[in-house]
UniProtKB/Swiss-Prot annotation:
Family matches, as SUPFAM superfamilies: Ribosomal L27 protein-like
HAMAP family, A to Z: Ribosomal_bL27
InterPro entries xrefs: Ribosomal_bL27, Ribosomal_bL27_CS
Lineage of producing organism: Bacteria, Thermotogati, Thermotogota, Thermotogae, Thermotogales
Protein's recorded name: Large ribosomal subunit protein bL27
Species annotation: Thermotoga neapolitana (strain ATCC 49049 / DSM 4359 / NBRC 107923 / NS-E)
């Protein structure tokens, strides 16, 4: 039984792909309907006026206008105000 036992297997050596989360537009910036405003995990930012939320909590503009970041009741809201 002159067999050599197989070596161990490396358990490191993998890396997850980047998720590109975060705020995509600045306060006061003009956006068009459908533009993505925030990509997030969970509701760090809540949808305000003229802002919709996708299944993955992505916030997007429903109308053309200027972006406004607001805070009410200890919650952060992103709104789009038409000009």
């Amino acid at each position: 039984m002159a067999h050599k036992k197989s070596g161990g297997v490396a358990k490191n050596g993998r890396d997850s792909l980047p998720k590109y989360l975060g705020v995509k537009v600045g306060d006061g910036q003009f956006v068009k309907a459908g533009n993505i405003l925030v990509r997030q995990r969970g509701t760090r930012f809540h949808p305000g006026k003229n802002v919709g939320m996708g299944r993955d909590f992505t916030l997007f503009a429903l109308k053309d206008g200027r972006v406004k970041f607001e805070q009410k009741n200890n919650k952060k809201y992103v709104s789009v105000y038409e000009e």
